[in-house]
Amino acid sequence: MVNIKMTIQYDGTNYFGWQRQRKGRTIQATIEECLRKIFQREIKIRGAGRTDAGVHALGQVATFKAELKMSLDILKKVLNSLLPNDIKIIKLENVEDSFHPQHSVKRKSYIYYLCFDEECSCFIQRYVWHYPWKLDLSLMEEALSLFTGTKDFTAFSGSTDVKNKIRTVHDFTMQLLTKLCFMDMCLNGNFIKFRIEADGFLRYMVRNLVGCIIEIGKGKLRIESIQEAFESGKRPSTMQTAPSNGLFLEKVIY
């Protein structure tokens, strides 16, 4: 038995998230079903983290153990031939038995795309949050730094049974783009690319942080409310959770 690490890309639009569920199509279950066809037995995979319904991934990581009777290159080709077009294995590699896709993680990074034009192309609406309202970009930029460092992110997480909600955000940036390139096409427009890197994330944390920044840019939330939320542990009253379609798990760092 060898421990095999997979790096995976997927478009999460048509899935109920990463984790296998009793009802609903998931990324994990889809990959496991294809592995079952190849190895003729049940194969369970472990992911580096769960992505919610509609969230995409550029570099999700998962592992599985199997008796390998073919090269990794051939396995990757066979697996990709069985997978639907919105899931792709981009790399397979052998790793030590001690490697764990969750416990061995040092950092993760996410990207979030927002389009703030009055109109947004139908070809990318499944990958961006279309928000056609005027935003104070300088105030949003100022607010980003308030989220970096080691803090208790209780106020910015979803309902979860995770007891320790202290996380260290190493980097949180926003970049203005006048062109967004997906696949083989580039579309002109006004976009914001948020990127956040941390030692770990709570459920809905990235989407809540982006939603908070947008509310500040819209003038619906005072910038002082961020520190107040950290101190009280209570969610800002006007904060919204950004929709899932603009969110990408960028990479997992070990």
UniProtKB/Swiss-Prot annotation:
It is an enzyme of class 5 (isomerase). One of its GO terms (molecular function) is tRNA pseudouridine(38-40) synthase activity. The active site is at residue 52. Substrate binds at residue 110. The keyword NADP does not apply. InterPro entries: PsdUridine_synth_cat_dom_sf (IPR020103), PsdUridine_synth_TruA (IPR001406), PsdUridine_synth_TruA_a/b_dom (IPR020097), PsdUridine_synth_TruA_C (IPR020095), TruA/RsuA/RluB/E/F_N (IPR020094). Keywords: Isomerase, tRNA processing. Its EC number is 5.4.99.12. GO terms for biological process: tRNA pseudouridine synthesis. The keyword Coiled coil does not apply. It catalyses: uridine(38/39/40) in tRNA = pseudouridine(38/39/40) in tRNA. Pfam families: PseudoU_synth_1 (PF01416). Formation of pseudouridine at positions 38, 39 and 40 in the anticodon stem and loop of transfer RNAs. Belongs to the tRNA pseudouridine synthase TruA family. Homodimer. This is tRNA pseudouridine synthase A.
